[in-house]
Amino acid sequence: MAMRAVESVRGTQLKTGRNRMARGRVSANPTKAAWTQVAQKSDLEANGGRMVVETSKGRVLLQELEGEVYAVSNKCPHLGLPLVGKTALFQGQVQSGCIVCPAHGTAFDLKSGDVRGEWCPKLPNLPLVGKGPPEKPLPTFPIKIEESGAIAVDI
């Protein structure tokens, strides 16, 4: 089955060639992409469409949703806790196209990384400090899947 490249422009897909790139952020310098092979599609499927991989930029969460694969930082931008960890306590759920931080309850859009809904709904709004650091999006990364099934992330 031949796959086509998809140029990523903030959620817009343009089919352009033989590889497939999932939606995500646009590389800051597309001529100097730093593609790093991180997994095989078969590994992702064997893990239920979700896995955390180690990269030079830290841990990246690969999440399959409705036939698309997304790559986002596995570190919640609020306090740096994992979205998907090694224990049952840290297993962020996917709801309405968002990964939800298991610690604070913030929902991050898998496509854009933007916060959807309330920032840190599980935390109290404390006098003077509020809910901690200000709202920040979750970093996202362009991803491509080769015909061989190799998954690469532009970091």
Language model features with spans:
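N-terminal pre-ligand scaffold of iron-sulfur
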Residues: 15-98, 109-110, 114, 122-155
